[in-house]
Every structure is written in structure tokens, then in C-alpha cells.
Amino acid sequence: MTATILMIAMTLSTILAILSFWLPQMTPDMEKLSPYECGFDPLGSMRLPFSMRFFLIAILFLLFDLEIALLLPFPWAAQLNTPSIVILWAALILTLLTLGLIYEWLQGGLEWAE
């Protein structure tokens, strides 16, 4: 029974795949080949200039978002037999992120306009 259903499904999908190549009109013209973007002609550069400052701020946001993800399990981990290890790891993570933030601040990465 399942072999019959499998053969019917494979045959039907093969027929539909072959028909999808034969049915479309094969006469491309300029209108069909040009992209349509909300009624505007897509002339000019497709890429907009990207601010490097914005990229740095986005990376910093991701780092501090990762900090939240790393520190979230610590209240539950503090109930372990050795909470001093948990506090040590939390302090280490916060120290590294704080040093990184101070470094970015001193390098001028957080200043939006110069």
C-alpha cells in the first residue's frame, strides 16, 4: 500500500516538474527581463552606503546582548554547592565586557559624530 502511494507521489511530482519547464512562454522580452520595484525604475546603485559607526554600535549591542544571555542562568546556578565559582565567573564576564567597553570608548568607537 505504501509503495503504491510512494510511486503515485513520485510519478505525479515528476510530471508536474516536467510540465513546469514546458508550460511557461519562452519568449523573453525587455519588460519580462527587467525587475519591477514598486513602479520605480531600478536605476543607479542597488547598495546604499553603510555607516561603519552604525556597524560598531550594532556589534557592541550584540556583545551586551550576549552578556545578558550568559548571565541569565547565574541566579539558578547560585543555588549550587559552590556559589563562589558562579560569582567568580559572573565577575570575570562583567570585567571583560567592561574592559572592552572602556577600550571602545577610549578609541572613539562610541562617538557618533566627529
Swiss-Prot record:
Recorded name of the encoding gene: mt-nd3
Domain of life where this protein originates: Eukaryota
Cystine pairings recorded for this chain: none
The enzyme's E.C. designation: 7.1.1.2
Primary location class: mitochondrion
Annotated GO CC locations: mitochondrial membrane; respiratory chain complex I
Protein name: NADH-ubiquinone oxidoreductase chain 3
Transmembrane segments: 3-23, 54-74, 85-105
Molecular function via GO: NADH dehydrogenase (ubiquinone) activity
Swiss-Prot/TrEMBL keywords: Electron transport, Membrane, Mitochondrion, NAD, Respiratory chain, Translocase, Transmembrane, Transmembrane helix, Transport, Ubiquinone
InterPro entries xref list: NADH_UbQ/plastoQ_OxRdtase_su3 (IPR000440), NDAH_ubi_oxred_su3_sf (IPR038430)
EC top class, as a word: translocase
Topology in membrane: Multi-pass membrane protein
Family of this protein: Belongs to the complex I subunit 3 family.
Function: Core subunit of the mitochondrial membrane respiratory chain NADH dehydrogenase (Complex I) that is believed to belong to the minimal assembly required for catalysis. Complex I functions in the transfer of electrons from NADH to the respiratory chain. The immediate electron acceptor for the enzyme is believed to be ubiquinone.
Subcellular localization(s) per the UniProt record: Mitochondrion membrane
Recorded catalytic activity of this chain's protein: a ubiquinone + NADH + 5 H(+)(in) = a ubiquinol + NAD(+) + 4 H(+)(out)
Pfam families: Oxidored_q4
